[in-house]
Amino acid sequence: MFGFVTAPFDLNLRHLRAVSAIAARGSMSAAAEAVSLSQPALTQGLAKLERSLGATLFERHADGMRATPQGVLAAQRAEAAFGHLARSVRGAAHGGARGFARPELLMTATQLRAFLAVADAGSFAAAAEATALSQPAIHRAVRDLEQLCAASLVERRGRGVILSPTGIRLARGVRLARVELVALIAETGAEAAGSGMLVIGAMPLCRALILPAAIAQFTRAMPRMKIDVVEGSWRELVDPLRDGILDVMVGALRETAPPECDQSPLFVDRLNVVARAGHPLAGTAIPSLDQLASYPWIVGQPGTPLRLQWEALFAERTLPHAPVECGSVMVIRGVLADTDFLTLLSPDQVALEVDRGLLSTIGGRLERSIRTIGITTRTSWRPTVAQAYFLDLLRDVSRAAGLQENR
């Protein structure tokens, strides 16, 4: 009877290594030797893995083992997962300590789950509670990983722990490996079609228009997919993206893609000066820079696209007084409604407030205030079919939004 695994670290890592070995060598005996298992043990392990996934990964032929389409996908994802682990522990041994040549090949799923729980929770007690493992089991798992890596992974701080530099690298590798295992389950499992998870980092502009429309269409087409939306600024989201906590970020792109990330533009957005309804400049068709500079401003944090656009607007004169730095559109709206402050925002971000007569745009869209809105992903990320479909929906919705803007 086929089952279905939902937790990535319920999978046996040695059996996953065997999947890659069988696919590469086409032989159970050669694969068994490669992963240091007897052939009967490998046969049993493969059967257990196939039952857990609810999928047939290999077919036996006269000339050896041949991977099914699901087996090919599983082998690719397993290779990617072990690749992330290998890179995270490369050169980890400290102080001349002699570690294992390939520690990632000796790690167990239980060890990785326990270590990641400590990394996320910040203490052994909280990690034990989160995983239903005992504290001694958590301690033992982390200690075993430290022996494999020949390096300290955690450091005590009061009642909790923090990760050492080696621990930080390993935690990222484990998270990225987990992403691959989640994708493996989604692509090969008994309910593979249209199932799985997508974690989206949502920056301010995309929350106003693009993302809600894309999610609405996506959930109608793929009701079994789970979507988790994490809101934040670019600075708050980029490290979780690189760590594998997020799958994709949607919002304003940077001039240069951050390390280990790729950027894909969706459309170009132009900004407006925004103020409260009834502001002294409301109704001014083309306000001068002197007029705009005579009022206080709310601006973005240094280095953010909104801040750079504001600085460019006043490049030919002294910057106006800007006592408030804020990246929260909700807070900005509230301050604007009760003051004579000005700010730069996309009209889409304040469309509802403008329609209700709470805020107003001053003048037209600023021709030089161009922001490219798009998708940021990890360079190593390979989306599942369902995740790739969501990206296509984002592009479709964005094209429609772009056409409306250019009318």
Task: List the predicted regions and their residue ranges.
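Short helix-boundary/capping micro-motifs
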Residues: 22-36, 118-130
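A short LG(V/I)-centered, amphipathic sequence patch enriched
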Residues: 50-67, 146-163
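Central regulatory/effector-binding core of bacterial HTH transcription factors
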Residues: 121, 126, 130-136, 140-143, ...
